[in-house]
């Protein structure tokens, strides 16, 4: 059976108070479905924090991926149901057993992938809230009985906040996060920070190789940072691409103080990011993790629009060639094309120059 992990939960059957939106009266038993990936889970966590800030007695259940759970597992007052997509039909059956006999006041369908849509059928809810028509893909609309308000050219995080809007949760001026780690991991991070001194994190690997910057340019940037008096460390996950990317950078013999690739848990990585002066990364999870702990990020982009997927609080600090790549490939500016359209090509990141990155570094440090 799927492991069901509980945070400390406040139980309540009372109803939400009235709000001035069109759906002013709903119940407080809420389930959200966002399985992956790390960056998107960071965005979803901001929405959860918003709900908890204004409705602290809400009963929240989060259906989440096995790996992603490791990042948010200590969030208070949330019941997590782990959905291991590698189990296929068995994962759906386990989810069904985990929510057996329950009816939620609202199910927030925050993932449009068909796998998530199909799995959502076993969750009983009075309101099944999905994305608006423009953002509905893979038959997403078939599984919802209500849609969030339409929105143009929004960041993924703002799109997730639309679900809180649909519930009537009061808006926030800026998002915030509450993603705790253990005292042991906090101490570990403090020890590493003390040993490293003033350091910058390079998280070089995205989930696809085409989104990665050139190893020699990462190496050149590490040397540039070292000349500015900064220690530089590499971080990444245990996957082959992460390790291969780190090794390619190290082969260039840059000034790297430590390589943490594949050597940290997600919580240890989060603490390393928290104590850093700056993070340099392509479109990858650690960039968004750094945002949750208020560390400045320089994002490197070519394939996706940083206005949509960039580090939320550091969009202006991205170095992006997305605009020119899209216009060259499509013959139109991205504003004239469907929102979220990606540029294609294995070598697009070659357009991101070290001079442009150095300029951002100088502005931030």
Question: What residues fall within each predicted segment?
Answer:
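Catalytic machinery of carbohydrate-active enzymes
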Residues: 1-365
